[in-house]
Amino acid sequence: MACSHQKNEQMRVGKPKWLRRSLPTGPEYEKIRTLLKGSGLTTVCQEAQCPNQFECYSKGTATFMIMGDHCTRNCRFCAVAHGPKALPDEDEAERVADAVSLLGLRYAVITSVTRDDLADGGASCFVRVIEAIRKKNPKTLIEVLIPDLAGNWGALQTILDARPDVLNHNIETVPRLYSVARPGAEYRRSLELLREVRRRAPQMVTKTGMMLGLGEETEELYATWQDLRESDCDILTMGQYLQPTVDHLLVQRFVEPTEFDRLGDVALAKDFLAVASGPFVRSSYEAEKLFRKAELARK
């Protein structure tokens, strides 16, 4: 498939009917939104305009983005702003832990912008948040969705020593598309990170996610899954890429729900322990359910 990834000035392609979903509304959602706004926290659910956010909240799951809302990289698919970085907030860990308590979360996902400007890539910030949640919410499961830490495996070990329940690092797309979609990232480095997690923490549940519709070919997907399984990755999520603004990469195609179902079945046959595949699937979608499946499959 031809792939026109040049900076575009045309309007975004209209969504097919299966991708039209209203953003959440109603008193319960407003209660949660007000609570999060009052805490001064950033959730990926709201920052990325995720259509699943209220569904996840109702299932006791939320994703918090730490270390600010500006990234040192400028991935062409991502809605997170690129620009000046603030110093990490020393009170952030306690505020996240408080929000987990107030929301009554059973499962908390902690992610971050990429902070190449910090010596440890923000590893110590992840640790502080994990420890604060565990102190106030000992029964809450914790998943960390981490950047590649610029290949700093000492920083990775710092996070692993805090013993999150799931270590997630998104491969995002096939290697051919990295130069246009993920400048500053390296496909092999992401695979190596997942391998390092397995080597350093053999019992850790590992996870990755991909966006479809950027111009990848089916055979490239299969090859990427094989690379992920050779890196001993347990869980795979796949969802439709949606162009955040006209300045981001164009959607090359909309993958139909039936094809997502088929691809999910093929991925499971590659021996992933759990797979979520669908147009609205995002990295933390049904996160607790996928973790439970993987945990059960490993026994």
Curated annotation (Swiss-Prot):
> What Gene Ontology cellular-component terms does the record carry?
cytoplasm
PANTHER family on file: LIPOYL SYNTHASE, LIPOYL SYNTHASE, MITOCHONDRIAL
Entry's family note: Belongs to the radical SAM superfamily. Lipoyl synthase family.
What organism, scientifically named, is this protein from? Answer: Desulfotalea psychrophila (strain LSv54 / DSM 12343)
Q: Which residues form the Radical SAM core domain?
A: 57-273
State the protein's name. Lipoyl synthase
Q: Where does [4Fe-4S] cluster 1 bind?
A: C45, C50, C56, S284
SUPFAM superfamilies linked to this entry: Radical SAM enzymes
Enumerate the UniProt keywords alphabetically: 4Fe-4S, Cytoplasm, Iron, Iron-sulfur, Metal-binding, S-adenosyl-L-methionine, Transferase
